Amino acid sequence: MEWTDDGIILGTRRHGEANAIVELLTRSHGRHLGLVRGGAGTRMRPLLQPGNSVGAVWRARLDEHLGYYALEGTRLRAATMLSYSHAAYGITHLAALARLLPERAPHDGIYEQFEAILEDFDDPVIAATHVVRFEMAMLEELGFGLDLSCCAATGTHTDLIYVSPKSGCAVSRSAGEPWRERLLPLPAFLRAGNEESSPDGEADIMEGFRLTGMFLLRNVLEPRGQAHSDARAGFIAAVARSRVTLAAE
């Protein structure tokens, strides 16, 4: 068995004295592990950092075997990313989200979004916007997507400012007013048709994380006996600190 694909390194762990098991998110083969000979050595260390993009050749005698990777760096961005505190937390959080996906199942849309985030990680606001949308995409990919296209109560497509925590559906201002204390705010940049828009300040970003965080925790993480990673909280805090620093300047 053999295939060639593009991949993003999610993590590594030592295997024996000299080798490493490397976990990739690949474009066409999903989340996939393989053994890298010599991967525990210092020569390979710069290549095998989370967030780097690689060209991967995987070989195994049978498809169900762990197999071996031959990797070649195509975009070695990890060293630059890790100079930003939000990026260091962010890549760890993204890797944790990717591990929610079943192994060896293609998720090419998720791969494309993941790579796009890595290219914009130097700007904390842009990175945070991408990460909120990535969490939305993960909910969709795992079968728990939110329906933000129209009001669950009236069917209207305008003035959608709330989300029902029970149904995950949008609610309009007028329909939601009597129950606004029980509803979640829907940031404008997450509304249907606003895919290219930016958050309106830090509050919008934080409301986005609150929204996705609640549904990820309830529908995905808690049923698996998991909680949000510390890296997620670290990323959100680092983004908030960067906003304070920029405002002070």
Swiss-Prot record:
GO terms for cellular component: bacterial nucleoid. The keyword DNA damage applies. InterPro entries: ARFGAP/RecO (IPR037278), DNA_rep/recomb_RecO_N (IPR022572), NA-bd_OB-fold (IPR012340), RecO (IPR003717), RecO_C (IPR042242). One of its GO terms (biological process) is double-strand break repair. Pfam families: RecO_C, RecO_N. It comes from the Bacteria. The keyword DNA damage applies. Keywords: DNA damage, DNA recombination, DNA repair. Gene3D superfamilies: Nucleic acid-binding proteins, Recombination protein O, C-terminal domain. Involved in DNA repair and RecF pathway recombination. Belongs to the RecO family. NCBIfam families: reco. This is DNA repair protein RecO. It comes from Afipia carboxidovorans (strain ATCC 49405 / DSM 1227 / KCTC 32145 / OM5) (Oligotropha carboxidovorans). The lineage of its organism: Bacteria, Pseudomonadati, Pseudomonadota, Alphaproteobacteria, Hyphomicrobiales. The gene is recO.
